[in-house]
Amino acid sequence: MFKFDKKQEVFELGGVKFGGQPGENPTVLVSTMFYARHKIVTDEDKGIFDRAAAETLWNTQVSLSDATGLPYVNQIVGETPESIKRYIEWFVGIDDRTPFLIDSSAGNVRAAAAQYCTEIGVADRAIHNSINASIEQSEIDVLTESDVSAAIVLAFNATDPTVKGKIDILEVGGSGQTKGMLQVAKECGIKYPIIDVAAMPLGAGSGATIRSVPTLKGKFGLPIGGGYHNMASAWDWLRKFKKTQPDPKAIYMPTDIGTNLVAQIAGSDYLLYGPIENVNQIFPAVAMVDIMLGETAKELGVEIADLENHPVTKLT
């Protein structure tokens, strides 16, 4: 594939390495739990869920990581301060090292989570998701005062989905922000900015999404990733077509997994792969591409950080 001329930063959080040259480190897989209408959740406001089922899902991911050598992170989604605190409390109780994203559609919930992580001493594992053009001052203030030092920085430009638009939102601002998102992150005390390219739907910027992966890595030298599976889930034609088929999931899943592999081969350092229930499909596929990236890295003179545990060694 390729090697970047610009030095590529590597951020290590909870033993997980984000970034580097393609193939230098295994691709990080980010599962999502407690998302909207997640079957294991019985009360989204209070954060009541089936703990046994949640732990089974999590242990499956741990086992697949052990088998493949791929690192993992958990994205914890909550819609109220009460629920996200409960989810975080559960997660840090069963796993004392793995980093996790704190995520919500509401800024006050993300702020409450950052504050809670600081209070209970796990802010060094927390990744704020995200710093974006719609962030409000109240969230900025709480994040600045917290001990959280890592954040997803979202390259979503509401008025310009092109590669240039993504660069602009990161560097100069827009969509109501007078500063670039990377500058906002710096002022919040973020030492480890991890860029999310903001995956766009097919026909509305999906090409620019993939092209932005090597472009942004080449320009900023920072870890790059995104929720590429959203390109498949937002595909109107596929949504309609799969309903006409006897096995809709069999039609859908190859496209869901495929979006991640396209981005991975383009240099994406991490993949927000969506529901943790898809863990069995995503790990072997991503490991396969990591073998290709590892082989190429060797040919290009890139030193693989942990060769023994990289899929290129572990699975061949």
Swiss-Prot record:
Keyword Transferase on entry: yes
The keyword Transferase belongs to this UniProt entry's keyword annotation: yes
Cited SUPFAM superfamilies: Dihydropteroate synthetase-like
Transmembrane portions of the chain: none
Pathway field: One-carbon metabolism; methanogenesis from CO(2); methyl-coenzyme M from 5,10-methylene-5,6,7,8-tetrahydromethanopterin: step 2/2
Molecular function as annotated in GO: tetrahydromethanopterin S-methyltransferase activity
EC number(s) reported in the record: 7.2.1.4
InterPro entries named in the record: Dihydropteroate_synth-like_sf, MeTrfase_MtrH/MtxH, MtrH
UniProt keyword list: Methanogenesis, Methyltransferase, One-carbon metabolism, Transferase, Translocase
Reaction(s) this enzyme catalyzes, per UniProt: 5-methyl-5,6,7,8-tetrahydromethanopterin + coenzyme M + 2 Na(+)(in) = 5,6,7,8-tetrahydromethanopterin + methyl-coenzyme M + 2 Na(+)(out)
Any one Gene Ontology BP term: one-carbon metabolic process
Pfam family, one: MtrH
Family statement: Belongs to the MtrH family.
UniProt function note: Part of a complex that catalyzes the formation of methyl-coenzyme M and tetrahydromethanopterin from coenzyme M and methyl-tetrahydromethanopterin. This is an energy-conserving, sodium-ion translocating step. MtrH catalyzes the transfer of the methyl group from methyl-tetrahydromethanopterin to the corrinoid prosthetic group of MtrA.
Protein name, per record: Tetrahydromethanopterin S-methyltransferase subunit H
Taxonomic source organism: Methanosarcina mazei (strain ATCC BAA-159 / DSM 3647 / Goe1 / Go1 / JCM 11833 / OCM 88) (Methanosarcina frisia)
